[in-house]
Amino acid sequence: MDLKNLQKKYPRFIYESYSCRISGKDLKISFNFRVEPGLSFNPVIIIQDIPKLSLAKFDNLIFNLGLIEMISYWKATCSPTIEIKAGSLNKEQINFWQGLILKGMGQFFFENKIPFQKPKLITGKTRLLKIIFNNLGRGILVPVGGGKDSAVTLELMKKAGKGVQCFSLNPTGAALKTMKVAGCKKPIIVRRKIDKKLLELNRRGFLNGHTPFSAYLAFLSLLAAAIFGQKYVALSNERSSNEGNVKYLGRTINHQWSKSFEFEQKFRNYCK
């Protein structure tokens, strides 16, 4: 399906709500997204073996995780309007998300040969309290994907004598091996379940392609660090992440933009 027809048929994407509950020792987070008319998605995140905690203090972090999760579903239709009912955003936050879509989705726009999109964001009135986590330890959360970057980070932290907590999303065999070799006895494991309806839309010819996964990992790592009491998050990103690799419609496309220093700085400022 082409962009013009998709946007005409599906003019509005809605981040309706999120929910979270303790299931055994795990935290189960669900998001409710809708696309008018007739499409809905309910992706799920499961954070395993969490400590005893009060869920209310994590509302803002979970709400923001839903915003980055939302992009994977919005891209199917590129609806020109995104309505945020689950919470509220100020002007600076709206600018952050529009910029993330514009730069972080550059490879997606290029792959699909469509114009750059900057959707209008309509925000709700629900105010989420900004929580200061004062009781964090001085530990370091290290996301592990199984590649050389995370292995380098773990080795550097080990040599520096730093306390490290390994963290992995849908860990592969390589990731599990890396954590074992690094001596991570009890890593934080997170399972992300994509709504199968999105995969069905992909098969039907809706828009599909690159999303800024490292930005997703940044928001998820922040939540995991807060839950498990880690003060810092350490990532190794190659220097080439700061460089674009192709020109498209007058803009430089960087398919690794969410690994760049520019994104890291914007993310730090956003989190403040």
Question: Predicted segment positions?
Answer:
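ATP-dependent adenylate-handling ligase core
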Residues: 50-52, 169-272
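RNA-binding accessory domains that recognize and position tRNA/RNA substrates
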Residues: 1-139, 151, 156-197, 201, ...
